[in-house]
Amino acid sequence: MLQHHQQQAQSGGYYDHYTQSPSPGSLTNADALNTTPFSVKDILNMVNQTEAYEGSYGHIDGAATASALFAAGEYQNPHQYLNHQQHQQSELPIPQQQLHHQHLDDGATTSSSLSPLLPPPPHQLYGGYQDYGMPAHMFQHHHGHPHQSFQHSASAYNMSASQFYAGASATAYQTPATYNYNYAGSGEVYGGATPSAVGIKSEYIPTPYVTPSPTLDLNSSAEVDSLQAPTQKLCVNPLSQRLMETASNSSSLRSIYGSDEGAKKKDNSQVTSSRSELRKNSISGNSNPGSNSGSTKPRMKRKPRVLFSQAQVLELECRFRLKKYLTGAEREIIAQKLNLSATQVKIWFQNRRYKSKRGDIDCEGIAKHLKLKSEPLDSPTSLPPPIPNHVMWPPTMQQSQQQQQHHAQQQQMQHM
């Protein structure tokens, strides 16, 4: 025990000079009595330090280099560190070598929490790892002892360092388990996708817009066959197939529309020809009954107007004043007397009755119009009002005579 206290006293000054802070477990840690040159905890802490240094300053892009450096850091760095520690411990006395391992262990944990370029200790990483939102099932013991498993702490540090130090490039330091997990998750995007969706990106060919040419026959199927050929080639791609179907449908609609227009033109020509034929037929039909009847006149050919002589008109006017409506016998008598037909006499009386009715209406309108005009004309005929004497100057002879007569009448009235 005395020897043990002496070794601690000798190492106290060296430790204070080395770390400038006392170790919390330097007196109570059971590992201080361990005489083995190196412990597993020392090796793991140094591996974490080397990985933190490489993660903060190194630039690794590929997954293969990440796995290679991870293996190199796991297997080669401990041997290099062993050689370096053996060289340093050979220079130190034996009592100080035992405490030197303990101080390196404690100093690694304290300096990692203080320095900004080194990772925090594993017991701090697990809480921060859960805050970053990563799934907890990636690690078997995410609440265990800080020095229980190297792979768990290293993977937790690598996930936190990817956001703190090196961004996206530091994710290459993940363990193979997390590396495969991430690529499996990202691979599901392409693995779960249908081959048609991939074909849309790789084998997409824009559908050519078919422009109608004036020399192209819309009823021919050459255009539709040329459009159906690429659809058979890209049958795997549903999007392009739909586009090609719409193009083929539009071409078929064009052909149908063109055929409909041709049919409409033919129908219009037929209608016009039938109309002309109907006109000819109606003319011939109207002329045939006129020729068959003989007495009746054809309607299409107007007969020239018959002019009545003055003697005939005077006789008809006298008969009309006597009687406006004639019987059949009276028409025959007048027709024989005037050398006219009974039909001409009948038509003349009809026209005369119509003219008489119009004349009565016109006469009434003219009479009303004349009456309206005569009313304002009667007012100027009345005598104007007498003009006062002081207005008229000098007075005329008539005015002087009128004035004298007026004074004489007034004097007579006064004497009476």
UniProtKB/Swiss-Prot annotation:
DNA-binding region: 301-360
Gene Ontology MF term list: DNA binding; DNA-binding transcription factor activity, RNA polymerase II-specific; RNA polymerase II cis-regulatory region sequence-specific DNA binding
Signal peptide: none
Extent of Polar residues compositional bias: 1-11, 18-33
Annotated PROSITE patterns: HOMEOBOX_1 (PS00027), HOMEOBOX_2 (PS50071)
Low complexity compositional bias, start-end: 281-295, 397-416
SUPFAM superfamilies: Homeodomain-like
Role this protein plays: Required for the development of heart and visceral muscle; for the formation of somatic muscles. Has a crucial function in the early mesodermal subdivisions.
Identification of the protein by name: Muscle-specific homeobox protein tinman
Impact reported for residue 238 to A: In strain: S-255S
Location within or outside the cell: Nucleus
Region (Disordered): 1-33, 246-305, 391-416
Keyword Nucleotide-binding: no
InterPro entries: HD, Homeobox_CS, Homeobox_NK-like, Homeodomain-like_sf
Effect of loss of the gene: Absence of cardiac and midgut visceral muscle, and defects in a subset of dorsal body wall muscles.
BP GO annotations: cardiac muscle cell differentiation; cardioblast differentiation; cardiocyte differentiation; cell differentiation; determination of digestive tract left/right asymmetry; embryonic anterior midgut (ectodermal) morphogenesis; embryonic heart tube development; germ cell migration
UniProt entry keywords in alphabetical sequence: Developmental protein, DNA-binding, Homeobox, Nucleus
Result when mutating residue 71 to G: In strain: F-96S, F-775F, S-26F, S-438S, S-483F, S-510S, S-521S, S-549S, S-565F, S-968F and US-255F
Encoding gene per record: tin
Matches recorded under Pfam families: Homeodomain
Record GO cellular component, one term: nucleus
